[in-house]
């Protein structure tokens, strides 16, 4: 079977579903990237770029997949082994080159195994310094690339470094070029940290540090579920859309990303239902946010009638009077 043909058929699905962009891991673009020469990588990137162009799709970002390789079992950038840290950095710089080859201007750092299961196994202070050094090396490697840090508090490590957007923003300000370092907020990751996703987004937006979002949902403090957006907490989803809309998110070309997984193995058209369903919920919530009575809201705020405000919000979301 021609794998390139399979990939092109997959890309052909996106536009009809209403999606304009694609998010990649480096080895999605270049399978077996560790074993290829720069010339081979460039050749493969050209093939992928052509497929994207043929289907009118924009590559939003590329992320280095650093949690599968044996060199990253204890983290890449924060590994105790200098050799393993070198591998992680080399792979990351190569990912920047891949992004550039396919016409992409952003790299996402989901720090995955950068953390520990046992606190005493790493020096956390030095680990954070090493993450910052990595970010600065990335910025130096390409003078235009943006770096979007995706926080997560746990999984696959018990205690991950950079668990919240506050940590990511702090690293951005400490970097050699703060304007090019931002965050990517995933709903479920914020919830797993015990935080409100809309407040995390608001914090990043207040600092002009929201590069992108991964909208999904999470049913309690357990493994990262990547549930369809709004299916566990519809009001929470409404508030995420409300915060993004109020800040004008998207007006500078930012994407709304969905990081959702199918409930189970599917065949045929069912393989994309989680994507179309989440998009539909999102679009309905955009309409709910845009039709919300702001004058009524302000009246209730001025009167400090928060019971009435909460009821009005819920009735609006439910579509009842």
Segments from the language model and where they lie:
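Active-site acidic/histidine proton-transfer and metal-coordination neighborhood
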Residues: 45-47, 53-55, 59-61, 69-182, ...
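Aromatic- and acidic-residue-enriched segments that line the glycan-binding/catalytic groove
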Residues: 37-39, 125-126, 274
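Active-site-proximal loop/turn and secondary-structure-junction residues that shape catalytic pockets
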Residues: 26-30, 63-68, 111-115, 151-155, ...
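Short, contiguous strand/loop micro-motifs
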Residues: 1, 35-36, 79-83, 121-122, ...
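Histidine-acidic metal/acid-base catalytic patches
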Residues: 1-5, 12-18, 97, 133-137, ...
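N-terminal pre-domain/capping segments
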Residues: 1-100, 279-321
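Short secondary-structure transition/capping segments
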Residues: 34-37, 72-74, 119-122, 224-226, ...
């Amino acid at each position: 079977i021609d794998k390139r043909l399979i990939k092109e058929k997959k890309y052909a699905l996106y536009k009809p579903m209403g999606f304009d962009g694609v998010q990649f891991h480096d080895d999605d673009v270049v399978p077996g990237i560790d074993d290829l020469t720069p010339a081979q990588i460039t050749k493969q990137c050209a093939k992928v770029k052509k497929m994207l162009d043929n289907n009118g799709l924009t590559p939003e970002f590329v992320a280095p997949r650093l949690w599968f390789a044996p060199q990253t079992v204890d983290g890449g950038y924060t590994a105790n082994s200098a050799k393993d840290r070198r591998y992680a950095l080399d792979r990351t710089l190569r990912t920047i080159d891949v992004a550039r080859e396919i016409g992409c201007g952003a790299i996402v750092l989901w720090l995955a195994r950068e953390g520990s299961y046992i606190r005493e196994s790493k020096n956390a202070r030095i680990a954070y310094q090493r993450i910052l050094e990595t970010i600065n090396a990335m910025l130096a490697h390409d003078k235009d690339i943006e770096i979007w840090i995706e926080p997560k508090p746990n999984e696959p490590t018990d205690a991950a470094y950079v668990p919240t957007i506050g940590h990511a923003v702090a690293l951005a300000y400490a970097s050699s070029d703060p304007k090019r370092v931002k965050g990517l907020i995933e709903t479920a990751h914020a919830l797993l940290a015990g935080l409100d996703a809309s407040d995390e987004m608001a914090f990043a937006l207040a600092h002009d540090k929201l590069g992108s979002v991964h909208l999904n949902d999470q049913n309690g403090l357990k493994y990262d579920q990547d549930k369809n957006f709004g299916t566990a907490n519809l009001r929470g989803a409404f508030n995420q859309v409300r915060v993004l809309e109020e800040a004008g998110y998207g007006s500078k070309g930012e994407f709304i990303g969905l990081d959702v997984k199918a409930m189970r193995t599917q065949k045929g058209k069912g393989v994309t239902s989680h994507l179309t369903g989440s998009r539909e919920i999102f679009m309905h919530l955009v309409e709910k946010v845009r039709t919300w009575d702001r004058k009524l809201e302000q009246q209730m705020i001025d009167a400090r009638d928060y019971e009435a405000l909460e009821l009005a919000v819920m009735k609006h979301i439910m579509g009842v009077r």
